[in-house]
A protein has these predicted regions:
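Membrane-helix boundary/coupling elements in multi-pass transport proteins
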Residues: 90, 113-126, 225, 229-238, ...
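Helix-loop-helix junctions that connect adjacent transmembrane segments
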Residues: 21, 63-64, 141, 170-306
Length: 467
């Protein structure tokens, strides 16, 4: 196996199967199912539950159409991931791809922006878990539940990627079962009692429908998909080559999109309030999904979904924390972060210090937010900007590698120009529609990244071309 240290190239062979791991390399133990489990855990199969009411109000009742459009939009990004993982099958995901396609400087900025979200998305998920558990057991403060969730999932990640994947599979199976219970219950109620709205309304909208409203809602709905890209960060730990990673990225997105479309379509048919009524009552939007379940099926399903969300959120954070650890590991291996973080534990085969570093930052952010009444709003308002910026650089990397540098032969224009340009354009529009606080945080984080890059460049590493 050729060395990867310092160059980012050459992790092509399988890792050791014994108890030791070559320095700077991760152990290849993950299969296709494991990759899909990590992706779906990070996304969460019932991710639309919390924002269903907001999307229904914004889109004029066409919430299922919103998720159809959002799946197509994010499909462009998934396709670009699939292109780049084949030419750079290494840990680090978009950091590695931007280095390959655009150069060292752009690679660092892409990784730096992605790191913002890889640290904050798990913090939001941990906070969701703490809030849900506090609602079930109010005697224990939500910040304590939040800290417990961080501790348990961090221990699982340190145990090893294969062990964490096995536990994650059990949790994911539980979430899928709860979702199936909702689907079956909703179908029974609809057959027995009929729908609260027209059968096509979730696809065509009501009197307040407009395509502009749908696109505005899509800018919110794409947040449900953040996390599928984490699959690419495990590229050095998968058996069977980079094609398996590419297939897992695309499969995970299509499966998650299908689940989102089905559940929002059924929930919209059960929703007793019209989209106009929801738009006029913002306080009702957050609980709209649960209110529809209560009114049509019963509170027992409400409680079942709530427990599923509490456990599922913690394990969504587990997958996010694991991905954050791999990103930190990859950047440290290239000496963009302290090289100590690139060490791989010889027993578990995971980047232990990188995971611990990510866990500490996430713990501080999550507990800080859990102790504030407005903490959730602060985190949610800024959580997407880093990933969206990194996705734009991902699309640019495809053009840079296949078209500008022509490193893989003649480009295929629809794959290497049309799809990346359309995908980047849509993402730029979403960034423009982001909240002011998200844009400010993103710009500040970007400015710090440029300062770090300038310092590293002055030391001779910042602007060199990728090998």
């Amino acid at each position: 196996m050729t060395s990867v240290s310092g160059s980012g190239t050459g992790a092509g062979g399988g890792g050791p199967s014994g108890s030791s791991v070559e320095e700077g390399k991760l152990r290849r133990t993950l299969g296709f199912r494991d990759l899909v489990v990590y992706g779906l855990l990070f996304i969460a199969p019932m991710a639309p539950v919390g924002i269903f009411g907001t999307l229904d109000a914004k889109s004029g009742g066409s919430v299922a159409l919103v998720y159809i459009v959002a799946t197509v939009v994010m499909g462009f990004t998934a396709f670009s991931y699939a292109q780049m993982v084949r030419v750079a099958p290494f840990a680090g995901s978009v950091f590695t791809y931007a280095r390959k396609g655009l150069g060292e400087g752009a690679g660092f900025i892409a990784g730096w922006m992605a790191m913002l979200d890889y640290l904050l998305i798990p913090a939001v998920a941990y906070l969701f878990s703490g809030i849900a558990m506090n609602a079930l057991v109010p005697e224990v403060s939500r910040w304590v539940w939040t800290a417990i969730a961080v501790l348990v999932t961090t221990l699982l990640n340190l145990w090893g990627v294969r062990a964490a994947a096995r536990v994650g599979f059990a949790v994911l199976a539980m979430e899928i079962v709860v979702l199936l219970v909702f689907v079956v219950s909703a179908v029974v109620v609809l057959v027995r009692d009929g729908a609260q709205r027209g059968w096509l309304t979730p696809l065509t909208g009501d009197a307040a429908f407009s395509m502009a409203a749908v696109l505005g809602a899509v800018s919110v709905a794409v947040l449900s998909y953040l996390g599928f890209d984490a699959i690419a960060s495990f590229a050095e730990e998968v058996t069977g080559g980079s094609r398996k990673v590419a297939r897992a990225v695309l499969f995970c997105l299509v499966l998650a999109g299908s689940l989102f479309i089905v559940q929002t379509y059924l929930a919209a048919l059960l929703e007793p309030m019209s989209s106009a009524e929801l738009a006029a009552d913002p306080a009702a939007q957050g609980s709209a999904f649960y209110d529809a379940v209560d009114a049509s099926v019963g509170t027992w399903l409400h409680d079942l979904v709530a427990v599923s969300k509490a456990i599922g959120a913690a394990f969504a954070a587990l997958a996010g924390q694991a991905a954050a650890g791999r990103l930190v590991f990859a950047m440290a291996r290239e000496r963009r972060l302290p090289h100590l973080l690139a060490k791989v534990d010889p027993k578990s085969g995971v980047p232990r210090l990188a995971i611990l570093g990510a866990a500490i930052v996430t713990l501080v952010a999550a507990v800080w937010a859990a102790r504030r009444d407005d903490g959730l709003n602060h985190l949610v308002s800024v959580v997407d900007i880093g990933a969206l910026t990194a996705f734009v650089l991902l699309h640019a990397s495809v053009v840079g590698w296949f078209v500008v540098r022509r490193m893989s032969g003649p480009p295929v224009w629809w794959k290497h120009v049309l799809f990346p340009v359309v995908g980047a354009g849509v993402l730029v529009a979403v960034i423009v529609e982001a909240t002011t606080s998200a844009q400010v945080v993103g710009l500040c984080w970007l400015a710090v990244g440029f300062v770090v890059l300038a310092v590293q460049g002055a030391g001779g590493r910042g602007m060199e071309r990728p090998q």
